[in-house]
A protein has these predicted regions:
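Alpha-helix boundary/capping detector
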Residues: 110, 117, 270, 317-321
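Extended catalytic core of nucleotide-activated donor transferases of GT-like folds
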Residues: 4-12, 18-129, 144-149, 283, ...
């Protein structure tokens, strides 16, 4: 009998990227002879549906449960039992961010929880912080080549693309400043430490600030102050495009909210206004499944790693494949 896997998802995030990844992984498993099921759970009714699955677990035709970036691990029935434990199946939880973003899920003491992550440092942090997790492996996300094959390099329309959402770091900073004084002090110290020492991981910076802190306390500290991490990523993303403009490198921007950046740049970078209007193009949001064709029509792409120090971001194989 072939292996059988159930994919669970609850909602569409990041340009429907998680659904795209699940579909791609499912296609590969089917090609290997696996039986694949995919259930999409509405967040309002996910508890009820998981409980139904748990009630009928003996008759459920699957061996593994797989999800990407969900918080389903923590869903309990009315008696307080975790639905995933009641299923009696091995659970594989694929996380695409730093583990602290998933602390509430990873901290759930499921009987057979397994984790896939993208970075070797993330794996080490998970193994040290959540000893109840049965297994943790590092497996980067692969990529698809554009349909129809590779477009000849000299026939591509775009010289440079950048695919990412824009978040105004100034707005994140102002929001962070409205917190209590302790969190503001943490925000300032933590962000500056990482900017000054970009080789550090988030957890290494925390351990320097709080010697002797435990893994769980580190995750809780980072989770409580997640805006500090958001600010760092937003500031780097903005600086990438600012430097492209200052050096007059044409670029096409794909993603949410770049129109906000361009309005800001037109005010603060008036000396570059003619260049911005002609050579910096906001192409708007696109679904993740459109990216292979977009990359296949560009000669170069820029990728911003989300502070991974020992891992690969999905946009890198996407560029390499196209």
């Amino acid at each position: 009998m072939s292996d059988r896997i159930l994919f669970l998802s609850n909602g569409s995030i990041c340009y429907d990227s998680t659904t795209y990844f699940i579909n791609c992984i499912g296609e590969e498993l089917k090609a290997m002879g696996w039986e694949v099921m995919h259930i999409r759970l509405d967040k309002a009714t996910q508890k009820d549906k998981l409980c139904v699955l748990a009630d009928e677990y003996d008759s459920q035709p699957f061996d593994y449960v797989f999800d990407i970036n969900t918080k389903l691990d923590a869903v309990c029935d009315d008696s307080g039992r975790y639905c995933f434990d009641r299923l009696g199946k091995a659970v594989w939880h694929y996380i695409l961010d730093h583990p602290f973003y998933h602390h509430d899920s990873l901290n759930v003491p499921l009987k057979n929880m397994n984790v896939i992550c993208l970075d070797r440092n993330h794996k080490k942090f998970i193994e040290e912080t959540y000893p109840h997790i049965n297994k943790c492996i590092v497996l980067p996300l692969a990529a698809k080549q554009a349909e129809g094959g590779l477009k000849p390099y000299d026939m591509r329309d775009n010289d440079l693309i950048f695919t990412a959402s824009y978040t105004d770091p100034d707005m994140v900073y102002f929001k962070a400043k409205k917190q209590d004084s302790e969190n503001v002090d943490f925000f300032n110290t933590f962000t500056q430490r990482l900017f000054d020492n970009p080789e550090l991981t988030q957890e290494e910076a925390i351990r320097q600030m709080y010697p002797g802190i435990s893994g769980v306390q580190t995750a809780e500290k980072l989770q409580e102050n997640f805006m500090a991490d958001v600010y760092i990523q937003a500031a780097i993303r903005q600086e990438i495009v600012v430097q492209l403009i200052r050096n007059h490198v044409p670029v096409k921007l794909y993603g949410h909210n770049w129109d906000t950046f361009l309005m800001k740049a037109e005010v603060l970078m008036k000396e570059d206004l003619p260049f911005i209007k002609e050579f910096v193009k906001d192409c708007g949001e696109v679904m993740y499944g459109e990216l292979p064709n977009i990359y296949n029509n560009a000669r170069l792409s820029i990728n911003q790693l989300p502070w991974f120090k020992a891992g690969i971001h999905d946009r890198t194989p996407l560029a390499l494949m196209n």
